[in-house]
Design a protein with these regions (language model features):
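Cofactor-pocket helix-loop regions in the catalytic cores of large enzyme subunits
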Residues: 1-138
Length: 138
């Protein structure tokens, strides 16, 4: 998790849930994620399984098992390609951004869709929802 449980369940605009089933592993957190969605948070589920939270998800990306890295690279490719990045944050607080940018340049949504066996447009929409949210934990 990238934030406190409270931040995720009470302060989020979008939640990116990757390979996790909080309703079974942490039922209270799972219930709070569902409540966050009911309050208006967007939910993106990235999981090959049809977990219960998929019913409330705005997007469910059913990745082929073992393709999480390609998915992450594809998300980064879209963030960069569509200029959905915080340039000042990158300049002030990151290192080797250009190397990462070079690494993900070939991970187009179409290539990632083929690798992960998902829809390229849904991947784009997931990236846009996540990148445009003010508060978006993973």
């Amino acid at each position: 998790m990238t934030n406190t449980i409270y931040d995720i369940t009470h302060e989020s605009d979008a939640i990116l849930l990757v390979g996790s089933n909080p309703e079974h592993a942490h039922p209270v957190i799972g219930m709070q994620v569902r409540q966050a969605v009911q309050r208006g948070a967007k939910l993106i589920v990235v999981d090959p399984r049809d977990i219960d939270l998929c019913k409330d998800a705005d997007i469910h990306l059913k990745l082929k098992p073992g393709t999480n890295v390609a998915f992450a690279n594809g998300m980064m490719h879209i963030f960069i390609e569509e200029d959905l990045i915080d340039h000042k944050f990158i300049e002030d607080r990151t290192e080797n951004f250009e190397a990462m940018k070079e690494m993900v340049k070939d991970y187009t949504p179409e290539k990632v869709a083929e690798i992960c066996q998902i829809d390229a447009d849904m991947l784009r929409e997931a990236a846009r929802i996540y990148a445009k949210a003010d508060r978006a934990p993973i």
